[in-house]
């Protein structure tokens, strides 16, 4: 730091945080969440759901089924709703758009949504991220000007 010129601004940032989870739902195990689903992707707290049929009605039906089952435990939206609400920012890169599921489920509280085929591995992790809690979505930033 001795060699850094006076007046230099120093910015230190961090990654988002993680939470410990208490509740686990295995998608499709003792629940109807795999109805009409082709592939489950994303993080256990932020699932991208790809459907066997990609039509406006199929997206609405799947989002409704997931929301009715999960209730307040998750935010469930169609791709179009996510974009319209700026969930991924005000401008969505076409590459990101291609990767989004037809339906997106973002866990709340201490919930994870485990893929039935990977439940053992995903469920073994203690810390998770990707939900809408403050600790998972805020990134720290410290700034100073060196004198």
Language-model features, listed with the residues they occupy:
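Feature captures the catalytic ectodomains and active-site-proximal regions of enzymes
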Residues: 1-147
């Amino acid at each position: 730091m001795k060699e850094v010129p006076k007046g230099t601004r120093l910015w230190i940032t961090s990654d988002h945080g993680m939470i410990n989870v208490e509740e686990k739902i295995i998608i499709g195990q003792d629940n109807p969440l795999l109805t009409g689903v082709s592939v489950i992707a994303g993080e256990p707290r932020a699932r991208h759901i790809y459907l066997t049929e990609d039509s406006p009605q199929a997206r609405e039906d799947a989002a409704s089924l997931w929301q009715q089952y999960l209730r307040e435990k998750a935010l469930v939206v169609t791709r179009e709703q996510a974009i319209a609400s700026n969930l991924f920012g005000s401008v969505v890169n076409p590459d990101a758009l291609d990767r989004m599921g037809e339906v997106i489920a973002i866990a709340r509280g201490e919930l994870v949504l485990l893929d039935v085929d990977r439940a053992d591995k995903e469920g073994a992790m203690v810390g998770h991220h990707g939900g809408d809690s403050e600790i998972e979505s805020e990134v720290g930033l410290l700034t100073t000007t060196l004198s």
